[in-house]
Amino acid sequence: MKNIIKLAYVVLCTLVVSCSSFLDEKPQSDFMQEGTGTEDQESKYGSLADAQAELQGAYESFKADIFQSENYTIGDVQSDNCYIGGDGVAEQEFDLLKLTSTNYKVELVWSQYYSMAGTATSVIENTKMMDPTSTVAEERNRVIAEAKFLRAWAYFDIVRLWGDAPMVLDLIPTITAENLDKWYPVMYPERSATDKIYDQILDDLNEENTIRYLVSKNKGIFQATKGAAYALRAKVLATRGEKSTRDYTKVVEACDKVIAEGYTLVSNFDELWQPDKKFSSESIFEVYYTSDAPNWAYWVLLKEDDGSVTWRRYCTPTHDLVAKFDKEKDTRYASSILWKSVPYDTYWPADSYPLSYKIREKTSNIILMRLADILLLKAEALVELDRTPEAIRIVNSIRERAGFAPSSLDENMGQARGRLAVENERQLELYMEGQRWFDLVRNNRLLEVMQKHKDKDGRLLFAGLQAFRQLWP
C-alpha cells in the first residue's frame, strides 16, 4: 500500500508538471533525468553520435537565461555595479537584495542549472555504460570529460548561490511499485552539504580522469578545453570554505596551468567586445551567437529600435561604478559604458543615461572566461600568500592595457592595500561579466561594500543588510 501511495504521488506530480507546462512560461525542471536508465543499467545510446547529440544539448544550457541575462543579474545587479532597470516585482527584489523563494527568477535559475547538471549526468553515465568495443576510447573519454566539466560548472554556481543543495549523480529508471522505495530518495534527494558538493565538483575537474581528455586551446570553438577546466578549478579552489582554510598555493598553480595553455591578452581592450572579433587570444570559454541564433541579451541591454533608446534598459551602471573609472585615462570606460538619452528614468538624468556596452549586437558572443579574469584571480591568491609585489605587477599589466603607466601602482603597498587594489581592478576590468557579487562574497566583503553603496541622491541603499542575504532562499 505504501508503494502504491508513493507511486500515485509520483504520477500525480508528473501530471501536474505536464499540465503546468502549458500554462507556465518558465516551468521548474525536475532534478533528475527520468527514464534515462534501467534497472540492469543499459545505455540508451546506440552510438557515440547519440552521446554527442545529448552533450550538445547540455552545451545549449549556456544559451539559456542563466548565462544570457541572469548571470548579469546575479553578478552585477546584486552588487554595486548595476541597477536592475526593470520595474517588475521580481526584478526589484534583486535590486533591493530582498530575494524571496517565490521569485520566479530564483525558480528559473534553479531549474536551468539542475537541467544542465542532469543532462550532463545522463551523458556521463550512459556513455560509461556503452560497449567499449563499439567506440573509439579517445572520443568516448572526451565526451565524458566534457560532460563532467559542464556538470562541475552547474554545481559550482548552485553551491555558490544556495550553499547546501540537492545533488543527483545517478540515472533514474522507469518507476514501478516494485522499485519505488529504491529510487524515491534519488528522485527527491535531501540537500547535500556544501563540502560534499565541492568534493564532487573537484572530482569532476580531476586532472587525471577529466582534464587530460579535453582538447587544448582551440581558437574559434565553443567547447570545453583544458584551459577552461583549469580556470574553473582555480575559481573553485579560490571560493571553497573560509579564506583562512583555503590553499592559495593550489589556486596559483591552477591559474598557472591556464596561462601555460598559451592564452594572451589582446592589446586593445575594446576588441574583446567588437562583434566581428570573436574567440580572441584572451578568450578561454566563449558562447557563440549568429544572426540566425542571436544573443537576445542585446535587446534588453542596448538595442535601439529607431535611433534612440525609448525605455530604460536592464543593468544600468551605478553612480558608484561610474565614479570609480578614471575617465581621462582608463580606456575601459568608453568600452564598457555607452551614454545615451532616455526619456524617463529614476537613476540618471534623461539626457545623459549610461548603458552597459559589452553586448553590442545580436551576434555578440558572451565571454564567460578570459585570461584577465584568471590573471587577477592569481593576483588575489598571491596577496593572500603575502606575495603582494608579484600580485601588483600582474595588476599593473592589466592597467597598462587600459591606458595607465606600466608601474601606476606601488608594488610595495602591503597586503591590506593590495587586497583592495586587486578587488578594485577586478571590478573595473570585469564589469558586466557576472563576477562582482561572487568576488565580494568570496572575500567576505559584501556586507561592508554594500552597506556603503549609495543611490543618485547620496542615500545609503543597504545600511541594514544582513549576512543571510549572501545565500539565495
Which functions belong to the PLM regions below?
Residues 1-30:
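Bacterial Sec-dependent N-terminal signal peptides
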Residues 29, 33, 69-91, 165-177, ...:
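Short, surface-exposed recognition loops and adjoining beta-strand edges that mediate ligand/DNA contacts
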Residues 43-48, 52-56, 60-64, 88-162, ...:
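Conserved, well-structured interaction surfaces
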Residues 86-109, 129, 177-188, 306-311, ...:
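Short, solvent-exposed loop/beta-turn-alpha elements that line the ligand-binding surface or hinge
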